[in-house]
Amino acid sequence: MLIFIISIIITIASIIFLFETVFNKNSNTINNNNNSNNNNNNNNNNNNNNNNNKNNIKENNIDKNKEIKIKEKLILNNNDPKENDLKYKEEFNNFLNKFSKNQEYGYKDNLIDNELRNHYNNNNNNNNNNNNNNKDDQFPKLKDIVYLDHAASTLASMNQIEEISKELKNSMFCNPHSVNPIGLKTKEEVDSIRENILNYFNAPYRQYSVIFTSGCTDSLKKVGEYFAWTKNSKFYYSLESHNSLLGIREYACESIGGSSTTSFQPIPSLYFKCNNNQFNDILEIIGNNDDNNNESYSLFGYPGQCNYSGTKYPLELINRIQKKYPKCKVLLDAASLVSTSSFDLTKYPVDFMTISFYKMFGYPTGIGALIVKNDSGEKCLINKKYFSGGTVNVSMAQERFHVDRPSLSERLEDGTINFMNIISLKHGFNIINNQLGGIDNVKLHTFSLTQYCKEEMLKLYHSDNSKQQQLCIIYSDNHFKDSSKQGSIINFNIFRSNGELFGYNQVEKLASLSSIYLRTGCFCNPGACHGYLNLSKKDIEQHLKDGHVCWDSKDILNGKPTGSVRISFGYMNNFNDVYKFINFLKSNFINDHKFEKEVIKSNKKINNNLCDISDNISCSGSCGGSCGSSGSGIEDYQVQYSNNIKEEKEEEEKEEIENLKNEKDNDEVLLSEIYIYPVKSCSGHKVVNDKWELVPSGLKYDREWTIIDQSGNYINQKKLPILALIQTEIDLINDKLILTAPEMKVLSIPLSYYPISAFDQIQVCGDKVDGLLYGDKDFSNTSGSSAGSGGGGGGNIDNISEWLYQFIGKRCYLVRKSPESHRKSKVDSSNEISFANESPYLLINEESVSDLKKRIIKDNPDSVPSDWNWISKHSFRANFIITGGKAYQEDLWSQFQLISKQQNDTTQSSSSPLVFNSVGDCNRCKMICINQKMGIEEREPLSTLASYRRSGGKIIFGQHLNFADSIKRNNSHTNDTALSSNESSISSSNPIFLHVPSKLKVLSERY
């Protein structure tokens, strides 16, 4: 028995052993086959555990007292390129610690926590299920840019666009006025959207109507146009209102027929401060003008939020006015307010409210709403004259008879509404309500970013002198402590280290180079703009005389700014955007003189203009001195260095300057090439003969033609880079202007022919220039072959406009400067210019171009030198190209003469040397970033120029010139003498020619 039991035990043990052996063998086989996967999974699990532990620690530290549950669907990803940057992480943690805990800032833990979550879980594989909600996926175009112009227009998410697209693909809609099933369904959808809008703003049941418009401006216009104005009415408005609200003033004046003192009353922003005393001041103003006549209504209009400064005005004022003066109806411009804040129509039952939906969720544009309290609409919006399809119950063609529809929305919506875009609105509201957890989350998120950004901006100072100069001045009525008083807008200007202001146009230019997109100007809010900038009526009138208008580049006039810079935040912004913006300010404006041209001065006279300057040093356009014909080199140079140049570079440059002190420079500076640009913004024509004629406006035929759009504004390469591909040629022998372009027939235009159509509204840099337009009746020739390959090219060309249209793809026209036009130079009013921007002549130095290219190659180590071959002298569109000498020495000259090589080599000459004055540095814009070979816009060379070639905040390269005189060479005298004005005047009877090549001799320098 014992033996039997032992036998059984041995058998069982053998079976177990055999089973384990087989199992282990199979397991090892599986493990071998999936070794890499298991390793990856183990690593992922470890990483996930580590990350989860980190996140738990972070969330426990930052998120102890949650008041609002984290919205899992909203993940705002920082995607910071500097994940290992300790400074970045430190700043990010400081930001989170402050704005997730400190309740005085009004922040409750929501969107920022999601941002934190995504930041630390960026590489966590367990977070893949949320990838469709992060910033990169929802806003892929923001990957490499920082968008800070949400007050103008926010952005639509990919989810929103996809849902709209899906509905358009799967559903069918038609005119809601049709009574077929599809039309009825469409009308139901539109009415449903009306209800959604009223619910979103918590409107009392059946007390409000939604009238769809093309936008907030159209809504305001309708109120002004339809309002029940009488001779006893008055229009009150906040001084800090948008132009669209101010425009109602014209309806009031026209309808009331009174003067400015009786028709309207502007209210200073000070009166809107949220306290009883200021409210009483406003109520007193209304009371002083209140009419007891029950038939008269007045209108009080103000913005819920100032689009200039972000100041929020007290909404309680609505109730106060309505309670005390029921005949004074209140109009709220809520476009800026509701973009990042809520509004409650039950709490603040305003009579009329206007909004634009693209400011709320980016798409669709062209849709707004006028939200009307029904009782106020029936009593006050009664002056509508026009009726149209959809607005009447019945009308007659034979006589003046029609009956309006009873409901406000039907009566005030003329024609077929934009039903497709209206239906798209629901997807925008879904983004706010569902994915973002409500507009209050958006407000808290954007306000936190705004607060932090403002605080960081105010920490920035220039620190290179004994008296610290703050970098930014912020225009606001409050301290950004309360989200009920301040929105997500920061308006500011930037100080230079010397206390002067940077022009806002220069700030925008540098921001664009850093892929930061913001807004500059006055933002269509003249009251706020002029008030904050302390601009008087006299200042504004003088600005207008000086040619300054809205949207131009004149940012500083008479030492005062004409506008400012505005940044604004949307829900898709995050800490990384603020971080990049603050670093942009630090790297581009702090101690701004380090970006300026470094000044090299000479104590001794120099010969033949040879101001010997190192290739690595740029000189200032504010240098000076005297030059003569004696001496053979450079002596006793004094170099003024920026205090912030790094020590290594400073020592290297000092050593190079010391070498230059003892060097005898025999380089000869020559005018080597002349270019004219017959058609403004098209390619240039190189002078191939040895001379070219000068005329009062500059080089003959230079910028004598321009291309304009249908509005009469000239078109340049910044608007249409393809213009760079239009080649121009002046054929003097055959009297032709010749235009060629890829795959187009050659177009030739007689030089001696002037068009018969006068056109005097051409806008060039703020000036109105008289021009002659080539119309259908004007003559031109086209050759039978195209300029590019293919032969056929542009097809039949009946006129010049058709040729331009076939190549450009846009309807535009060619205009020639009228012979009677005598437009004055921007930099020297004693000189004429044609369609040029500022001066008759522009000069650049080949050596300066070469130095710039070296810097570009050095600053872009990932590229190869050939990548930058497209950057050349042609990028700068100069008339005069000089060679020889040193880079940037042209900045030193105040006056020089050009001596023909023929004159230099012979004792007799039929013409005299020509004298030119330097009248200013050329302020560069993104025009130089147009690849002249490809007709596309690039980032360089403006980006590199901005790092070392600034003067007074402007980015400069090249010199503006004017023609001063010709020189009579008299063998009996050793000195050069200038001709009298009669002798030197440019006229057909006394033509003056500039020769190529010519030797350049400096007559004087600039200090």
UniProtKB/Swiss-Prot annotation:
One of its GO terms (molecular function) is molybdenum ion binding. It is an enzyme of class 2 (transferase). Coiled coil: none annotated. Its EC number is 2.8.1.9. The keyword Transmembrane helix does not apply. Keywords: Molybdenum cofactor biosynthesis, Pyridoxal phosphate, Transferase. It catalyses: Mo-molybdopterin + L-cysteine + AH2 = thio-Mo-molybdopterin + L-alanine + A + H2O. The active site is at C524. It comes from the Eukaryota. The modification N6-(pyridoxal phosphate)lysine is found at K359. Residues 816-995 form the MOSC domain. PANTHER family: MITOCHONDRIAL AMIDOXIME REDUCING COMPONENT 1 (PTHR14237:SF19), MOLYBDOPTERIN COFACTOR SULFURASE MOSC (PTHR14237). Sulfurates the molybdenum cofactor. Sulfation of molybdenum is essential for xanthine dehydrogenase (XDH) and aldehyde oxidase (ADO) enzymes in which molybdenum cofactor is liganded by 1 oxygen and 1 sulfur atom in active form. This is Molybdenum cofactor sulfurase.
